[in-house]
């Protein structure tokens, strides 16, 4: 797929598929894509926003409608799937979270399904939606997998980080949270600076590792799909099907890991020392 009608070489093709649709504000107006190269931090990846919010709304609508139509008799396939997800995540939350908080199970379910749906977009053929958007809407760049955008995974993990800090302060108080940062692992006033550095690094590493793990796995998977798409048609079929089947495991596993680590981190935040 080319942005101006000419064929792209392999390097340009890869770069094209790894470029987000951007929007920014310049000189009081709105600019897109290449015009946003110097906009810096204030650049919106509108494709990531569109697909992540859209998939979040789809998740809420789907589960809400299923709940409205739930019957006591023989459930349909969709109701069975929703009930399996809800009951499974609820069981995991009860086994992994050792405090008392009614928010944890719904939060874990939301994270798992939302991240799973965003990851699932990676199974759509790499040229299918971008080519349609370019041909019919004139959109030259489009990344359809939100979790291949570090901004999305960092946004998710920073939200978890805020909850970790909030519940740590709520459970221990400001004084207890401060002591946790300054008097562990060495309980002596002279080692407060060392403790603070060690505990701060440990705390900050949680959202960073969450974000990079999810981003790295999905970005690598998307890159492999792009490389397969550059091959002859017979090689594409021979390689894309096995990789897609294997990638289903990665999609589910990464959503599960993100959910589990969120539960574990919040459980640790509720513990009183």
UniProtKB/Swiss-Prot annotation:
One of its GO terms (biological process) is proton motive force-driven plasma membrane ATP synthesis. Keywords: ATP synthesis, Cell inner membrane, Cell membrane, CF(0), Hydrogen ion transport, Ion transport, Membrane, Transmembrane, Transmembrane helix, Transport. It is found in: Cell inner membrane. Pfam families: ATP-synt_A (PF00119). It is a multi-pass membrane protein. Its main location: membrane. The keyword Transmembrane applies. InterPro entries: ATP_syn_F0_a_bact/chloroplast (IPR045082), ATP_synth_F0_asu (IPR000568), ATP_synth_F0_asu_AS (IPR023011), F0_ATP_A_sf (IPR035908). PROSITE patterns: ATPASE_A. One of its GO terms (cellular component) is proton-transporting ATP synthase complex. Gene3D superfamilies: ATP synthase, F0 complex, subunit A. The chain crosses the membrane at residues 44-64, 104-124, 149-169, 223-243, 244-264. CDD domains: ATP-synt_Fo_a_6 (cd00310). SUPFAM superfamilies: F1F0 ATP synthase subunit A. One of its GO terms (molecular function) is proton-transporting ATP synthase activity, rotational mechanism. Key component of the proton channel; it plays a direct role in the translocation of protons across the membrane. F-type ATPases have 2 components, CF(1) - the catalytic core - and CF(0) - the membrane proton channel. CF(1) has five subunits: alpha(3), beta(3), gamma(1), delta(1), epsilon(1). CF(0) has three main subunits: a(1), b(2) and c(9-12). The alpha and beta chains form an alternating ring which encloses part of the gamma chain. CF(1) is attached to CF(0) by a central stalk formed by the gamma and epsilon chains, while a peripheral stalk is formed by the delta and b chains. Belongs to the ATPase A chain family. This is ATP synthase subunit a. It comes from Shewanella sp. (strain W3-18-1).
């Amino acid at each position: 797929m080319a942005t101006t009608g000419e064929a792209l070489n392999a390097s340009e093709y890869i770069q094209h598929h790894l470029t987000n649709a951007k929007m920014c504000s310049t000189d009081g107006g709105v600019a897109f894509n290449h015009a946003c190269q110097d906009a810096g931090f204030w650049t919106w990846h509108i494709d990531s926003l569109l697909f992540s919010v859209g998939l979040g709304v789809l998740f809420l609508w789907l589960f809400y409608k299923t709940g409205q139509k739930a019957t006591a008799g023989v459930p349909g396939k969709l109701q069975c799937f929703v009930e399996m997800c809800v009951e499974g995540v609820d069981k995991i939350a009860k086994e992994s979270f050792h405090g008392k908080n009614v928010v944890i199970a719904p939060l874990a379910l939301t994270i798992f399904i939302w991240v799973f749906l965003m990851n699932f977009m990676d199974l759509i053929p790499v040229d299918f939606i971008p080519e349609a958007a370019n041909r019919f809407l004139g959109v030259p760049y489009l990344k359809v997998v939100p979790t291949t955008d570090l901004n999305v995974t960092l946004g998710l993990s920073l939200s978890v980080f805020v909850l970790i800090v909030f519940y740590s302060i709520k459970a221990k108080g400001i004084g207890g949270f401060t002591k946790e940062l300054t008097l562990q692992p060495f309980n002596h006033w002279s080692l407060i600076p060392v403790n603070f550095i060690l505990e701060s690094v440990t705390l900050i590493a949680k959202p960073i590792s969450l974000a990079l793990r999810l981003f790295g796995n999905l970005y690598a998977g998307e890159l492999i799909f792009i490389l397969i798409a550059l091959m002859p048609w017979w090689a594409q079929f021979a390689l894309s099907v096995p990789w897609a089947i294997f990638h289903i495991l990665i999609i589910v596993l990464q959503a599960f890991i993100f959910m589990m680590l969120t539960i574990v981190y919040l459980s640790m935040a509720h513990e009183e020392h």
